[in-house]
């Protein structure tokens, strides 16, 4: 993540937008030496918002920890078991 003063960004905004749009890079923009804004690409912003949404769901952290423990102890299900459980037929080859 780069930190740049607003004076650097002003004349080259298009260039910096292109840079963050094509990467997961973020640019912290300072004003009078203090952080004032962060420039991120739209895809990265959407991803961050989705992550925040899921992390805000009650019990999600516990569910993830439980799933990790299941995987670590070998309690997993194969494709055939999942398809049978939910009544999903196999795809034709």
Curated annotation (Swiss-Prot):
Keywords: DNA-binding, Repressor, Toxin-antitoxin system, Transcription, Transcription regulation. InterPro entries: Antitoxin_Phd/YefM, phD/YefM_antitoxin, YefM-like_sf. Induction: Expressed in log phase cells. Also expressed in human macrophages 110 hours after infection. A member of the relFG operon. Coiled coil: none annotated. One of its GO terms (biological process) is regulation of DNA-templated transcription. One of its GO terms (molecular function) is toxin sequestering activity. The keyword DNA-binding applies. The keyword Oxidoreductase does not apply. Belongs to the phD/YefM antitoxin family. Interacts with toxin RelG, which neutralizes the toxin. Also interacts with toxins RelE and RelK in vitro, in M.smegmatis coexpression with non-cognate toxins increases the toxicity of RelE but not of RelK. Antitoxin component of a type II toxin-antitoxin (TA) system. Upon expression in M.smegmatis neutralizes the effect of toxin RelE2. Induces its own promoter, in combination with RelG represses its own promoter. Has been seen to bind DNA in complex with toxin RelG but not alone. This is Antitoxin RelF. It comes from Mycobacterium tuberculosis (strain ATCC 25618 / H37Rv). The gene is relF.
């Amino acid at each position: 993540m780069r930190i740049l003063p607003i004076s650097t960004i002003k004349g080259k905004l298009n260039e910096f937008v292109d840079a963050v749009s094509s990467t997961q890079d973020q640019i912290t923009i300072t004003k009078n030496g203090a952080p004032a804004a962060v420039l991120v690409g739209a895809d990265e912003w959407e991803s961050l918002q989705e992550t925040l949404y899921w992390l805000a769901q009650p019990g999600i952290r516990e569910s993830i920890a439980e799933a990790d423990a299941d995987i670590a102890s070998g309690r997993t299900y194969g494709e055939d078991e999942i398809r049978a459980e939910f009544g999903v037929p196999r795809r034709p080859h």
